[in-house]
Design a protein with these regions (language model features):
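Structural recognition of the beta-strand scaffold that forms the well-ordered cores
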Residues: 114-118, 123, 160-164, 223-228, ...
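Surface-exposed acidic, glycine-flexible loop patches that form ligand/cofactor-binding
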Residues: 105-108, 209-220, 256-262, 336-340
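Catalytic His-Asp segment of secreted/periplasmic serine-dependent ester chemistry enzymes
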Residues: 180, 235, 273-340
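N-terminal secretory targeting modules
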Residues: 1-118, 122-144
C-alpha cells in the first residue's frame, strides 16, 4: 500500500507494456477525497500520467510502446493518508513484440542520503496547486513534489520519507478560530509516528489499534529528520502562556521520541510559513532538548511568513513559490550540519 504523501514504488523492466492492478476505497469517498497517483518514467522530472483512482479495483496501463525497450517506472501517491487509500495488488509486464521474453530487471538503487519529514498539511503539499478562493479542498490540488519536503530532498539529492497528516499537531488537532479552544487529542502526530500507516489500519482495514503494524526503525535509518509541526497547535495555544508551556513540554518529549528511534540522525525543527505564534516556543524547546541531549545534532530553522505576492493555496496554504523559499533555508542548514 502507498500510504503517506509521496510514498512510491519503482521497478525496471524490458518489454513493451506494464500494467498495475490497484485497489482503493473510492466508493467510500467523495470525488474530491479520492486518491491521486502519478506515473514517472526514468529520471523524468514531470510525470507521464497523473490520475484519480475512481474505482475500488481497477487496472491501469502504466506504460505502453510499440518497440521492446528498457524502462524504469515509478508510481507516486500524490494525495495524503487522510483520504482514499491506494494499494497495488500486482504489476504485469509483457513484451508484445517478443511474447514471453519480457524481463524484470533489478530494482533501482536507493539514494545514499535519506531524509524523513515529519509534519502536517504543509509537508503533504496540501492545496499547493489550489487557490485561496477555493471553498472546498480537492485532493486534485495536492502535490507533494511542490512541498518544501520533496523540494528540500531534491536540493540535497536525498530520498525523502514523509510522515505527515493535515490538521494534526503535537498536542491537538486544528481548532477553528471561531470555536472555543477545547483540545482535540484524538489523533496526534506522536502517536502516528509509531506506526507504518495508522490511517490505513483504522480506515481501510478497520483493525484494532493493538493489531496495527508498527514502523521498523531498525530497517529505515535516515541521516536527517525534519520536523515541521506546530501550525495546528497554534490554533489552541493562541499566545496563552500556560498553553504555550504545555506545547513546549510536549514538543521536547516529541524530540526525545524521534531521537530515541533515530539515534544517529540529525534533527531540524522548523515552522513559520503559515503561522508564527509558536516560533519562539519551538526554538526554546529545541534549545532545551539540545542542552540535555549533547549526542544529537539539532538546529531550529526559522521560516519566513508567506507573502501574498507569492500566492496563497487552498485554505491559505503555501504555494510552490513559498515552499521553494522554505526548502532553500532548510537545505542550507542541512548542508552545514551534515557537511553535505
Amino acid at each position: 500500500y502507498l500510504g503517506y504523501s509521496a510514498t512510491s514504488i519503482s521497478f525496471k523492466f524490458v518489454g513493451t507494456k506494464a500494467t498495475a492492478e490497484i485497489v482503493s476505497d473510492a466508493s467510500k469517498h467523495t470525488e474530491k477525497e479520492r486518491a491521486w497517483i502519478a506515473i514517472y518514467y526514468g529520471q523524468d522530472r514531470d510525470p507521464a500520467k497523473r490520475l484519480r483512482l475512481e474505482q475500488d479495483r481497477q487496472t491501469i496501463v502504466l506504460f505502453e510502446t510499440q518497440q521492446t525497450t528498457e524502462q524504469q517506472i515509478t508510481i507516486v501517491k500524490y494525495s495524503e493518508a487522510e483520504y482514499a487509500a491506494c494499494g497495488i495488488v500486482s504489476i504485469e509486464i509483457t513484451d508484445e513484440v517478443n511474447p514471453g521474453e519480457e524481463i524484470l530487471l533489478s530494482p533501482p538503487v536507493h539514494k545514499k542520503r535519506q531524509i524523513e519529514f515529519f509534519g502536517d498539511s504543509i509537508t503533504c503539499g496540501y492545496g499547493v496547486e489550489g487557490d485561496v478562493s477555493d471553498e472546498i479542498f480537492d485532493t486534485a490540488d495536492e502535490n507533494p513534489t511542490k512541498s518544501y519536503s520533496l523540494l528540500t530532498a531534491e536540493l540535497l539529492n536525498a530520498e525523502p520519507n514523509l510522515v505527515s497528516w493535515n490538521g494534526k499537531g503535537v498536542i491537538t488537532a486544528y481548532i477553528g478560530e471561531e470555536e472555543d479552544a477545547q483540545i482535540d487529542d484524538s489523533w496526534l502526530m506522536p502517536m502516528l509516528y509509531e506506526y507504518t500507516d495508522a490511517g490505513l489500519e483504522r480506515d481501510y482495514f478497520a483493525n484494532e489499534q493493538s493489531d496495527w503494524e508498527t514502523w521498523n526503525f531498525e530497517e529505515y535509518k535516515p541521516q536527517l529528520v525534519v520536523i515541521y509541526l506546530g501550525t495546528n497547535d497554534a490554533s489552541y495555544t493562541r499566545d496563552i502562556p500556560d498553553r504555550q508551556k504545555q506545547f513546549e513540554d510536549a514538543y521536547v518529549k516529541l524530540l526525545h521520541q524521534v531521537h530515541e528511534h533515530n539515534p544517529n540522525a540529525a534533527i531540524i525543527t522548523t515552522i513559520g510559513a503559515m503561522d508564527q505564534r509558536l516560533n519562539t516556543t519551538i526554538d526554546a524547546a529545541t534549545a532545551c532538548f539540545a542542552k540535555v541531549t549533547p549526542d544529537c545534532t539539532i538546529r531550529y530553522v526559522q521560516l519566513p511568513l508567506q507573502d501574498e505576492v507569492d500566492g496563497l493555496g487552498t485554505y491559505w496554504h503555501p504555494t510552490e513559490k513559498t515552499n521553494r523559499k522554505c526548502a532553500r533555508l532548510i537545505a542550507d542548514a542541512a548542508k552545514e550540519m551534515l557537511q553535505w
